[in-house]
C-alpha cells in the first residue's frame, strides 16, 4: 500500500468526516484519477521532438501516453486529420497515489517562486492546473530536453463542491495560496 493511500485511509477520511459532517461514509470524497496532458501542436511538425516529449511524459507518469489525434484537417494551421497533436496519461490506483506523493513532496518545491497553487476549482469537485515546464520533474534528463514543454494536470475526485475537493487535496499535500 502506498504511503499516501495509507494516510488517506487512516487520517484524511476522519478529517473530512469531522469537517463536513457526512451522514454516510460513502459520501467522503475520494481521489478517482489524475490526468496529465500535453498539447504538442508545434512538436507535431518535428517527429523527433514529438517522440522526445512522449518519452518524457512516459518517464514522468510511469506509463505509456496515449497520443491524441486531430479530428479534422485545418489548412490554416497546416493540420491534417489523424495527425498527432497531443498526449495524455490517466493514472489510477497505486500509480495515481505515487504520482501525487512525488508531485506534492518533490516537484512542487522545485517550482521557482512557488507560493501555492490557485484555489479555484471547476465547481464539480475537480481541480486542474498548468505547469510551464517539464524540467521541474527530477525524472526528466535535462541534457536530453530539446524544448521546454508545459503540461496540464487534472485531479478528478468524487467531491461535490470545490471546498471538499480542495480540502481533500490539501490534506494529501497539495499547497494552495492563502485567501486574503
Swiss-Prot record:
Keyword rRNA-binding: yes
GO biological process: translation
Coiled-coil annotated spans: none
Annotated InterPro entries: Ribosomal_uL5 (IPR002132), Ribosomal_uL5_bac-type (IPR020930), Ribosomal_uL5_C (IPR031309), Ribosomal_uL5_CS (IPR020929), Ribosomal_uL5_dom_sf (IPR022803), Ribosomal_uL5_N (IPR031310)
GO-annotated cellular components: ribonucleoprotein complex; ribosome
UniProt entry keywords in alphabetical sequence: Ribonucleoprotein, Ribosomal protein, RNA-binding, rRNA-binding, tRNA-binding
Similarity remark: Belongs to the universal ribosomal protein uL5 family.
Oligomer and partners: Part of the 50S ribosomal subunit; part of the 5S rRNA/L5/L18/L25 subcomplex. Contacts the 5S rRNA and the P site tRNA. Forms a bridge to the 30S subunit in the 70S ribosome.
Protein name: Large ribosomal subunit protein uL5
Encoding gene (name): rplE
Amino acid at each position: 500500500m502506498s504511503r499516501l493511500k495509507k494516510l488517506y485511509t487512516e487520517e484524511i477520511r476522519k478529517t473530512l468526516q469531522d469537517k463536513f459532517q457526512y451522514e454516510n461514509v460513502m459520501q467522503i470524497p475520494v481521489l478517482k484519477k489524475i490526468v496529465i496532458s500535453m498539447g504538442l501542436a508545434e512538436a507535431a511538425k518535428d517527429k523527433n521532438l514529438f517522440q522526445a516529449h512522449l518519452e518524457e511524459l512516459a518517464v514522468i507518469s510511469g506509463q505509456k501516453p496515449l497520443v491524441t489525434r486531430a479530428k479534422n484537417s485545418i489548412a490554416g494551421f497546416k493540420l491534417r486529420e489523424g495527425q498527432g497533436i497531443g498526449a495524455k496519461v490517466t493514472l489510477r490506483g497505486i500509480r495515481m497515489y505515487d504520482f501525487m506523493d512525488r508531485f506534492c513532496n518533490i516537484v512542487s518545491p522545485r517550482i521557482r517562486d512557488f507560493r501555492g497553487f490557485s484555489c479555484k476549482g471547476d465547481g464539480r469537485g475537480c481541480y486542474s492546473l498548468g505547469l510551464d515546464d517539464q524540467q521541474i520533474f527530477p525524472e526528466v534528463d535535462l541534457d536530453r530536453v530539446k524544448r521546454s514543454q508545459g503540461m496540464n494536470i487534472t485531479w478528478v475526485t468524487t467531491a461535490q463542491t470545490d471546498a471538499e475537493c480542495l480540502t481533500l487535496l490539501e490534506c494529501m499535500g497539495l499547497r494552495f495560496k492563502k485567501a486574503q
